[in-house]
Amino acid sequence: MGGVQARAADFRTKASITQKMHDKVRRIGGSGAELALSEACLGVAKVAHLLRACGDELFEEAAALWSFDRVQKGTLDRLVPGCDAEARLQASLGLRVGGLGMRRARDVALPAVIASRAVARPKVQQLDAELAKAGLLPAGRLLAEHDAASGKAVGMLKAELDEAEATQVERLVAEAAATAAVAWLRRMEGKGDEAVAPRA
């Protein structure tokens, strides 16, 4: 509701709140503890719900994403003096690959919304059928809009990647959608199991 500008404003508000929380964590006085808390509690997870809902729109409103990434950058620069662009990039990587897990909202926005839409597709498909049955929308309209938005986000992500990575995106999205469809069907049959998502 409220359009892209309203969502960008919500995101900036969340970034401002995160900055205030970083300022409070700073009082701890220990850079190791502060870094751990910043990654675990004040990272991109603070805005993940917004990125999953409208990451593509926020990606186009780069200033909104930068409002959050600037907070992360400021904390990292303060805790690791002399941090250059390459060090910040490494810090944004996951712990398993030698980073600090301080992911940037800009890097997560498109994958988050694409994953969310892939998982939501079976639910949207069912809702589309129910709305058509009730005479509220023409059959296929809601699903077509959902698929168009998903396709646009996939195209945006592919444009950000090198050719080798970009060729994998559609396959990964198709696999995620197929897995989501099977999981949704199992839930509808009362056989669903709610797995806990792994931490990155």
Labelled PLM ranges:
Residues M1-A200:
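Nucleic-acid-interacting cores, centered on viral/eukaryotic replication and modification enzymes
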